[in-house]
From Swiss-Prot:
Its cofactor is Mg(2+). It catalyses: (2E,4Z)-5-hydroxypenta-2,4-diene-1,2,5-tricarboxylate = (3E,5R)-5-carboxy-2-oxohept-3-enedioate; (3E,5R)-5-carboxy-2-oxohept-3-enedioate + H(+) = (4Z)-2-oxohept-4-enedioate + CO2. The keyword Ribonucleoprotein does not apply. Its EC number is 5.3.3.10, 4.1.1.68. Keywords: Aromatic hydrocarbons catabolism, Isomerase, Lyase, Metal-binding, Multifunctional enzyme, Repeat. Pathway: Aromatic compound metabolism; 4-hydroxyphenylacetate degradation; pyruvate and succinate semialdehyde from 4-hydroxyphenylacetate: step 4/7; Aromatic compound metabolism; 4-hydroxyphenylacetate degradation; pyruvate and succinate semialdehyde from 4-hydroxyphenylacetate: step 5/7. Gene3D superfamilies: Fumarylacetoacetase-like, C-terminal domain (3.90.850.10). It comes from the Bacteria. Decarboxylates OPET (5-oxo-pent-3-ene-1,2,5-tricarboxylic acid) into HHDD (2-hydroxy-hept-2,4-diene-1,7-dioate) and isomerizes it to OHED (2-oxo-hept-3-ene-1,7-dioate). This is 4-hydroxyphenylacetate degradation bifunctional isomerase/decarboxylase. GO terms for molecular function: 5-carboxymethyl-2-hydroxymuconate delta-isomerase activity; 5-oxopent-3-ene-1,2,5-tricarboxylate decarboxylase activity; metal ion binding.
């Protein structure tokens, strides 16, 4: 699997029924109006026959579903035209720990090593009326039909491509029911559906696997960008949030990356698009269960990113929605990677943002809530960080709106200067 794996939460009617009462109360206050997207990063993806790793002391749930595989580049496509952009479908297992909330990114539940088995692709005549069967150790444990999904495969492709360009090889997991099948070490989980190659994976205790296997994740040219929400206390206060007690980590899709001296599009009819100057840590070698004391040994260097956000699209659940943070070209990054040896103290760097030459934002990495070693240790405790992966460490206070015609310049002392222009939708087309 070479592309990005997108997944959607709350797309099965049984989930909405189960959460209906909760969604009428704080912090949600209303059910979701749009699809609730998240990303399964590359460390999660395994093939037929490879082991699902069972973390000690956790409850692990199987999530049988179907993956739509994108066949050609799709941007802003109507659902009626979606079939032209679909190469085929594959069975998938959206493995997860139990979720007690949809209010924050569920990276610890969703993004562990091996938590996204994907089967072989095949054409399918009717994905919207497909019975999906889960067998555990040769016996049926569950079945459900895609007719009960809230949004069809075509509707999901259309909704996602409205703000994110989909590329050949990308996958969209169509959703899972509320009730999932519990797994145990030693189980063999097999997923079946008429017309698609079966997907079968053993479940192996994580510590046993580590003792008996030498395992190297396949590397790709593009690493995963993990981003931090509210990692500066002054920024949390600026947005009227309490500083988090645990890192709020979300994932940026590759479609959102753009380079130095490139443009970012402000959508028409929005009221608030703001910049976010961030120090980015680049991982230099594979990291798994790394202590804080040794974490900096795994850093290759640093760069700068601008994590633009469209606040109009932020709904009050499962933050942040991809429509806010993963739109095409919304994350300028660069202009280069500075070797870690050239930065004597990454926790004492000044960040500044200028809009049309006017200083709008200024802060220091000394005010990070969660330090770089802590973040590397935290993430590597439950997932494998790979060379080329990146961690955007958050932004300080000082946000303001930007409009077409603005030049936005980010500076981090000792790391780099990143320049970007804002354009309207018409100029981008």
């Amino acid at each position: 699997m070479k592309g990005t794996v997108f997944a959607v939460a709350l797309n099965h009617r049984s989930q909405l029924d189960a959460w209906q009462e909760a969604f009428s109360q704080p912090p949600y206050n209303a059910p979701p109006k749009t699809a609730v997207w998240f990303i399964k990063p590359r460390n999660t993806v395994i093939r037929h026959g490879e082991p699902i790793l069972y973390p000690q002391g956790e409850k692990v749930l199987s999530g049988a579903t179907v993956a739509l595989i994108v066949g050609k580049t799709a941007s802003r496509k109507r659902s009626e035209a979606a079939a032209e952009y679909i190469a085929g479908y594959a069975l998938a297992n959206e493995v997860s720990l139990p979720e007690e909330s949809f209010y924050r990114p569920a990276i610890k539940a969703k993004c562990r090593d091996g938590f996204c088995p994907l089967g072989e692709m095949a054409p399918l005549s009717d994905v919207d009326n497909l019975t999906i069967i889960t067998e555990i150790n040769g016996r049926e444990a569950d079945h459900w039909n895609t007719a009960d999904l809230q949004r069809s495969a075509a509707q999901l492709l259309s909704a996602l491509s409205e703000f994110a360009t989909l590329n050949p090889g990308d996958a969209i997991l169509l959703g899972t029911p509320q009730n999932r099948v519990a797994l145990r070490p030693g189980d063999r989980v097999r997923i079946l559906a008429k017309g698609l190659p079966a997907l079968e994976n053993p479940v192996v205790a994580e510590d046993e696997f580590a003792r008996n296997q030498t395992f190297t994740w396949p590397l790709s040219a593009t690493g995963t960008l993990f981003a931090l929400g509210l990692n500066y206390a002054d920024h949390a206060s600026e947005l009227a949030f309490t500083p988090p007690k645990e890192p709020l980590v979300f994932i940026k899709a590759p479609n959102t990356f753009t380079e130095h001296h490139q443009t970012s599009v402000r959508p028409n009819n929005v009221e608030y698009m703001h910049y976010e100057a961030e120090l980015v840590v680049v991982i230099g070698k594979t990291a798994r269960k790394v202590s804080e004391a040794e974490a900096m040994e795994y850093v290759a260097g640093y760069t700068v990113c601008n994590d633009y956000a469209i606040r109009d699209y932020l709904e009050n659940y499962y933050r942040p929605n991809l429509r806010v943070k993963s739109r095409d070209g919304l994350t300028p990054i660069g202009p280069w990677i500075v070797d870690k040896e050239a930065v004597s103290d990454p926790h004492n760097l000044t960040l500044r943002t200028f809009v049309n030459g006017e200083l709008r934002q200024e802060g220091t990495t000394a005010d990070l809530i969660f330090s770089i070693p802590f973040l590397i240790s935290y993430l590597s405790e439950f997932m494998t960080l790979q060379p080329g992966d990146m961690i955007a460490t958050g932004t300080p206070k000082g946000l303001s709106d930007v409009v077409p015609g603005d030049e936005v310049v980010l500076e981090i002392k000792g790391v780099g200067r990143l320049v970007n222009q804002i354009v309207c939708e018409e100029s981008a087309n």
